[in-house]
């Protein structure tokens, strides 16, 4: 039985995973979690010890994939507002999380990630994680600059001058942009990295 007969689950922080390419539909595969056939499967990052090739959207949405493989779809240390803490001997001492635990679990265990050139980074705004909109270049954002919460600060955070965006930021290029939107105020945020 193929699972994609039912509607795809909704993901609060990644609402259009088919459009962003987080899920692929080019073949029918067996989900490594539920062992059901599916023609919609996850192709983004999944951090775990086991070798996991295919996950269906439903096993991501209900958290069963993260639970079964003790994995995550987003690295805790690569989320704005979440930091690793270390003791005096530089040993890992835990996570400093400024968000409610359930909110962090929703993002890390039940939200499909996205592909970055280096390490994906999830942005936040208004006390909540932002929605991932997609991959962008300068041409995708140049007419929307007034919609950003603070584009200059976003650029500084990923290591580029705001004045260099027009010549550097290219969708699929060496400097790739990742567009996010605040769930509460609707302002845009930008992350980027380099190949």
Swiss-Prot record:
Disruption of this gene leads to hypersensibility to nitrofurazone. InterPro entries: UPF0167, UPF0167_CbrC. The gene is cbrC. Induction: Induced by the two-component regulatory system CreC/CreB. Belongs to the UPF0167 family. NCBIfam families: colicin_tol_CbrC. One of its GO terms (biological process) is bacteriocin immunity. This is UPF0167 protein CbrC. It comes from Escherichia coli (strain K12).
């Amino acid at each position: 039985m193929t699972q994609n007969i039912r509607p795809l689950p909704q993901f609060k922080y990644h609402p259009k995973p088919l459009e962003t390419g987080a899920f692929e539909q080019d073949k029918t595969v067996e989900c490594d979690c539920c062992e059901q056939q599916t023609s919609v499967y996850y192709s983004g990052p999944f951090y775990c010890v086991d070798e996991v090739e295919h996950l269906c959207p439903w096993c991501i949405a209900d958290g069963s994939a993260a639970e079964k493989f003790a994995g995550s779809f987003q690295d805790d240390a690569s989320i704005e507002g979440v930091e690793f803490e270390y003791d005096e001997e530089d040993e890992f001492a835990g996570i400093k999380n400024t968000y409610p635990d359930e909110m962090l679990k929703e993002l890390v265990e039940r939200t499909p990630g996205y592909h970055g050139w280096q390490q994906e980074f999830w942005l936040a705004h208004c006390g909540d994680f932002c929605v991932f909109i997609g991959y962008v270049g300068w041409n995708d954002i140049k007419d929307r600059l007034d919609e950003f919460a603070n584009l200059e600060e976003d650029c500084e955070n990923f290591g580029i001058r705001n004045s260099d965006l027009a010549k550097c930021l290219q969708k699929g290029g060496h400097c790739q942009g990742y567009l996010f939107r605040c769930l509460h105020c609707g302002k845009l945020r930008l992350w980027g990295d380099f190949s």
